[in-house]
Amino acid sequence: MRTLVFARVIALFGFAALLGGCGNANTTSADAPQSPAMRGVIASASDCVSFGQEAVTACAAAIERAVTRHEASSQTYSNIEACEKAVGANKCERAASGKYRQKLSAFMVSLGSSPRAEPLYPAKDGAVGFQSSDKSTYLASDQSVTFSRLALSVAEMQASPKKGGRRPSL
């Protein structure tokens, strides 16, 4: 029995080595497409796993810095009506201080030598996507940006018209 298992393992390694030789040997790193998974829109730290297990810690730390930046720099309003007048209906959240601010909905995460995450907010005009504080827009229909499943669900929910009353915050 042990010999059979050993033989299967050896066969798998041999097959993997054989396949490793397949492909275009002339492809250089400059020719290779960049992985779209190293930059993308995610909705939570749990989405960091979409960048690969080795990137989870860097991704989560970048998100934590983005949340801190959002909390420190977001304009606050004394009531929800003033907030919604400034940023739009159903696009506000209540801060720990009791004041209202624009709802933090997702993050644009870029991993590399200096991992970073940018806070993202609901897109304008019912578009399925998000926008940054500098008004850069990331739409789900844009093929150059990867959305996690959760981020796509959040974008779709925020873009769909509400049906009676306020939609709950995420």
Segments predicted by a language model, with ranges:
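Mitochondrial intermembrane space
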Residues: 2-6, 10-11, 18-170
